[in-house]
Amino acid sequence: MLPPPVDPTVRVRPPAGKRSDMDLTTALDARDATVCVVGAGGKKSTLFALADRLDRPVVTASVRIPIFDDRVAAVRVTEDPVTALDEADEGDWPLGLVPERERSDRYLGYDTETVAEIADAAPGATLVKADGARLRDFKAPGEHEPQIPSNADVVVPIASAHVVGEPLTEELVHRPAEVAAITGRDIGDEIRPADVATVLASPAGGLKGVPGDATAIPVVNKVDDEADAAAARAIAGEILFRANVPRVILTRLIADDPVVEVVE
């Protein structure tokens, strides 16, 4: 029996390639790059995991950031970060740069123009927290988010695998109404892998504000067991189908080797 004719109007997902031999800095193209993290469920962990593995990196922010003095060698609170870079000693790396301590538990961030100046002056990678998520695992950006400098090389949209199967509510999701608008789902609906992928791959979601010459490399974090891995692989496959990104990184950022899998 002959196979049925192929309908040329139907798009078929090609099988995704998988590998686990890529380290985090290579997977995120982070060496000597300006890397901006957005989304929820692993932004700060990504910044610090990269900072631990790169040569003379800067950690900074264009939005509020929790106190991180214990995650870097030194923090300079300064309105003149370029001078602080020039004056940094060999023992100051990774170096944190922030403009002001807003309260006991967080710093303010610089405007994007200043972050761009930091990146231009930095001797290595500049790692930037570029939006907030209020400790949730999944989000869509607000009206004035993200805050990405124009010279960003890599933008990393992040979500946690743990949201799959959970309800679309404020308990785990920052701005669930915006997520619902992007995905066409209703508040309270069960979050599917396709919903996470839709947000991460959307110009109104994870790809919002990505400069034209920057590379977006999505991350699905908190891949803690095989169920999480299955959900993360499904998310990754959908992202690769929907968006022009080179790969999706599956991570467990609290692990010594944080890359679980690279899906290309």
What are these regions (language model features)?
Residues 59-64, 242-255:
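Beta-strand->loop->alpha-helix junctions that form or flank phosphate-binding loops
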Residues 37, 57-62, 96-99, 126-130, ...:
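General beta-strand structural signal in soluble alpha/beta enzymes
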Residues 1-34:
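Extreme N-terminal, non-catalytic leader segments
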Residues 106-107, 120, 133-243, 261-263:
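Conserved catalytic-core segment of NTP-binding enzymes
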